A protein has these predicted regions:
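Conserved glycine-rich Rossmann-like NAD(P)H-binding loop of the short-chain dehydrogenase/reductase
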Residues: 29-46
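Active-site helix of classical SDR
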Residues: 121, 156
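Conserved glycine-rich cofactor-binding loop
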Residues: 8, 15-16
Length: 270
C-alpha cells in the first residue's frame, strides 16, 4: 500500500460533494491538492479546510472547455512540478424520460461527464506516466447497470468506464494505475442539481439523503482504493448486488429496477 503524503492530486468538481470531501481527505493525508471547478470563489473559501496554503491550489476550470483542461494541467505542473493522481470527479446528472428530453441535455451530460474526463486525462497523461501515477474516473452504478430516466447519465458513465478500461490495457506495462470508482447512492447535491427534460435543475431530491452514504465516507473509500492501487471499486452492498445481478440475471434486474424507480418520490413512471 502506498502513501498519499506529498503526492500531487488534482480533483475536478472539487467545490462540493464527493470532490470536496476527497480533496479534504487527501489533504488530511499530507497530499498537495489541486482543486478544480467552475466555482472559483467558493473554492478559495473552502481551500483552508483542505490543506495549508502552500499545499493547495485552486484553479477555475470548466471541464467542457478543452483549453480550461489544458490550463489546469499546466497550472498544476507550474506550481508543484508534477502530477501523481488525477481524480475525474466533475459531473452532472439528469432525471427525465428520454421521450420528453431536449437533446441538449444529453449533449451537456456527455460534455461534462465523458468529455471532461477525456480532456483532463489527455493533458495529464504524460505526467501521470512519468510519475507511474493514477487516473480515476468517478462513475456510478449507473455506469454498470441502466437507470431509467437517466439515459444520458448512464450513457456518459458507461462511456467513461469503457474509456478508462481501454486506457488501462493500453498502459498495462507502463506503471499507470487506472481506477474506475463507482460510489453508489451518496449524499450530495447531485440530485438537486440534476437536469430535467428542458435542462433546468430539478431543485429537489427523490431520496432521503440522510440515509445515504456520506461524501466523507466515500472519500475515505476512494483514498484507500488509491493507496491500494485498485483498478475497480464498487461501493455499497446494493451497488455490488446490482452489478452482480446485471451480469447474471439482466432481465430480472430490469424488472426490479423498474419497480424501484416507480416507488421514488415524483417518479417519472407516474
Amino acid at each position: 500500500m502506498i502513501s498519499l503524503k506529498d503526492k500531487v492530486i488534482i480533483v475536478t468538481g472539487a467545490s462540493s460533494g464527493i470532490g470536496l470531501a476527497s480533496a479534504r481527505q487527501f489533504g488530511s493525508e499530507g497530499a498537495k491538492v489541486v482543486m478544480a471547478a467552475r466555482s472559483y470563489d467558493r473554492m478559495l473559501e473552502l481551500a483552508p479546510s483542505v490543506a495549508p496554503p502552500e499545499r493547495v491550489l485552486c484553479v477555475r476550470c470548466d471541464v467542457t472547455v478543452e483549453d480550461d483542461c489544458k490550463s489546469l494541467i499546466a497550472a498544476t505542473v507550474e506550481r508543484f512540478g508534477r502530477i501523481d493522481i488525477l481524480v475525474n470527479n466533475a459531473g452532472v446528472s439528469m432525471r427525465a424520460m428520454f421521450k420528453d428530453l431536449d437533446l441538449k441535455v444529453l449533449h451537456t451530460l456527455m460534455d461534462v461527464n465523458f468529455w471532461g474526463t477525456v480532456q483532463c486525462t489527455k493533458y495529464a497523461l504524460p505526467y501521470l506516466l512519468e510519475a507511474h501515477g493514477s487516473v480515476v474516473g468517478v462513475i456510478s452504478i449507473a455506469g454498470y447497470a441502466a437507470l431509467p430516466a437517466r439515459t444520458g447519465y448512464s450513457a456518459s458513465k458507461f462511456a467513461i468506464r469503457g474509456f478508462l478500461d481501454t486506457l488501462r490495457i493500453e498502459h498495462l506495462k507502463d506503471g499507470l494505475n487506472v481506477l474506475v470508482f463507482a460510489p453508489g447512492y451518496t449524499a450530495s447535491n447531485v440530485r438537486k442539481a440534476a437536469l430535467t427534460a428542458d435542462g433546468t435543475p430539478q431543485g429537489e431530491t427523490p431520496l432521503k439523503e440522510g440515509n445515504l452514504m456520506s461524501a466523507e465516507v466515500c472519500a475515505k473509500r476512494l483514498s484507500r482504493a488509491l493507496r491500494r492501487r485498485r483498478s475497480k471499486r464498487i461501493l455499497t452492498l446494493l451497488g455490488r448486488m446490482t452489478v452482480r445481478a446485471h451480469n447474471v440475471f439482466p432481465s430480472l434486474l430490469d424488472r426490479w429496477t423498474y419497480r424501484y424507480i416507480a416507488r421514488e418520490s415524483g417518479s417519472p413512471f407516474k
